[in-house]
Every structure is written in C-alpha cells, then in structure tokens.
Amino acid sequence: MREGGVPPPADAMDLPPPPPDVVHPAAKFCDLPGSVRYETTGVTMVAGGQTATIPPSLAFLKLPTNFCVHYYGKVGNPRQVRFAPSGELFVASPIGITTGGGAGGQSSIVYLPDDNRDGYADSVSIFQDRLPQTQGLLFTKTHFYYQDNTKIVRVPYQVGDRFPRGEREIVADITYHQSLLHWPKPLDEADDGTIYVGNGGDQGEACDLQRPFKGGIVRLDGSPGGLPIAKGFRNPIAVRCQRGTNKCFAIELAKDYSAEEGGREKLVPIREGDDWGYPCCATRDVPHVEVKQTADCSKTVPEDVSFLIGDTPFGFDFEPKKWPTPYKGNAFVALHGTAGPWQGARLVSVAVNLDTGDLMPSTTLGGVGGGMRNFGTGWDDTTLMHGRPAAVTFAEDGRLFLANDNNGDIIWIAPFELER
C-alpha cells in the first residue's frame, strides 16, 4: 500500500476514463442545460438540467449581463481547487481547524471529472486520503504536488492519472513556524519552474524588531525546509502565478480587528527580500498601535491592492485572456466576508496591466475603487444559506470555477460567447 494512500485496482492507471454518455450538442458553455443566464431582459435558465439530484438554486447570485453560472458539484470544506491537465477538478478537502470553518471535510484530495461534458461533475472520487491538513495543490509537467501538514510532497503524474502513480516523495518539511490555525501551505509554480509556498504566522505575535521569519513565502530550492524569501505575513492564505509573465502573487490576511489602526488585507507580488510588515506594521509608515513608538515601518513594502479588514480575500486566479473587456486577464478574488454574518462575501475582479502583468492599484478601503470591480454578489443576504466564496480556479477552457467552503457547493461561471 502507498504511504498515506489507498491502493488502486489492478491496472487502474492504464485504463482510459469511462466513455462519455450523451454529449450535449451546445456549442457554447452558457447554452448547456442548467445554465442560469443573465440577459439584458432578465435572468433565465436553460431547461433540461440535472435531475438525478436536484442542484441548489443559484437565484441568489447576481452577475453582470452576458454571463452565466452553472452548478458543478459538491465537496465538503473545499479549500483549494485545481484542474489536472486532463480536465478533472482536484479539490483539497481537509478536516483540520481552519479560519474558514467549513464542515464535512473528507481528510482527502478528491477529483471531480466531467467526462460527458454536460457541465456537471460525474462523480467525486478520492485521489489521496489520510490528509487532515491539506490545502496546497499543484500540477507540474512531471508531478502532482500537495500539502500534508508541514510537508510538501509529490507523486509522479501523467495526464489522465486518477490514482497516485508510484511512491510519494517529501520535497520539503516547512517548520520555520508552525501555526495551529494558519497551517495551510498554498503553492504554485512560476513560468521559470520556481515553486513558491506560503507559510502562516499567528494572530498574537509580538513585534520583534529583529524581524525573524515566521509567516511568509518559501521557495523550494532542494533544501529540507525550503528557502524563506519574503516575510511579514500573518496568513498568506493563497499563492498564484500568472502565466506568461513569470510573476507570482499572494493574498495576505492581516491582523484581525486592525482596520481602525490602518490595517488592511493585501494582494501582493512575491519578490525576494520583501518585508510586508506583520506583526509590527500595517503598511509603510503605519505601525500597529501597540508598537507605535518603537517600530520603524519606513522599509515596509507598500501594497498596490488592499481590502478592508473583514472582506477576507481567500482565493484567486488569473483569467486566461478568453473573457471580454473589461475582465480580460483580470485577477478574480473570492472574498470570504466577515466572520458571523459573512458581510461582504462576494467575487471581485482586479484589473491587470496586460503588457507587464502588474496588478492595477485597487482597493475596497472606503468603497470599491481603482482597478477593482464587484463581479459576483448575493452571498451575504443574511440567510447564511449560500456558502462563502473560498477557492477559485480557471479551467483551461476559460470557465471560472468557484468553491464555497461552508456548504461545499462548486459552481462555474462563463461569458455567453465562450465556446466549448
């Protein structure tokens, strides 16, 4: 038996995926049965959707006109979503205590194929089990990487694999600081092959003027624990790289309840040597109140993209330039909203300079401004019935997939003209 896994049936890795049932003739994704379409004249639904199990209503959701939303499937506590090169949606479903508080985790990485291409997941199957603390997922040309608590491990991967191929290998054991709450280790690969991993700090850290590494970004360099390259993070909850630019970014969930002292959540570039301030500084020249007289924040890197404390940016990905203007190439960010009422839970887009790959200055401080737009809203209608937006990924075909960690629903969104 594989370490930490389940044995596949004989020759399972050599079997092709199950044959598709009936492939719907729709030429565009938004014409598939079950699609909720946002027309200029109102909201309509394409008849003939899934009936074996009744999908949840998506009537609460508000999107721009000429877009559609479609239910895909359900996984308890989906904390990260990634597409395999062969099209299966992989989902990290942990049970370890997390800031999201999602229920029904499977302590596994599961996958959801759509072999008949009807827009719904065909099934939910376990790829790797016995993973109570897992979040980071990454496919490279040769391997599948994933988080197992403090460890980043990998298994050989070939297109179409639905079981681990061979023994797992520990790539790094990141123990510079081990947070019981901020244990997730998101990761991604830059265009040049560099892999970056987030490592969480803690809410109650005292300001140490020597600035040791605790929460920050680690580069996998072949050493046992990886190389710390950027510090001053409380909780780098998400890491993503933008294709074609060799640039990577991270979301920082900053000090709770610090809005009145200048605190803000951030979406920042990953660069070697950067110090983003925590736990001493909220941003450049803005020390946290308890160290106002002692902390020097003049060298803290200023952010270009900021969010109100409590908006709680949770996951993001970059649109692969298949959507129309003004969304082409944007970063799409899932906002988890405030604890309790989930106020502010929504999906926003952040404009990107398509020539350089840089994020345009954007903020939700004092209202949505700069290069940021509200894209999907409706989760925070006080009912607590629709989940909280958590993980985001784009499929190669251009659809945006969004997972809600509190109810497990996974949906996809597409513009009307996106072809299958």
Describe these PLM feature segments:
Residues 77-79, 104-142, 375:
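Blade-loop segments of beta-propeller domains
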Residues 19-64, 184, 201-205, 212-215, ...:
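Beta-propeller domain segments
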Residues 84, 92-94, 140, 147-149, ...:
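Residue-level marker for isolated small/hydroxyl-bearing positions within beta-strands
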Residues 71-76, 125-132, 171-179, 227-232, ...:
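Surface loop/turn motifs at the tips and blade-to-blade linkers of beta-strand repeat domains
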Residues 1-22:
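Ser/Thr-rich, Pro/Gly/Ala-heavy low-complexity intrinsically disordered linkers and tails
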Residues 60, 85, 89-120, 158-160:
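Beta-propeller domains
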Residues 123-129, 133-140, 149-190, 202, ...:
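Asp-box/WD-like beta-propeller blade repeats and closely related beta-sheet repeat scaffolds
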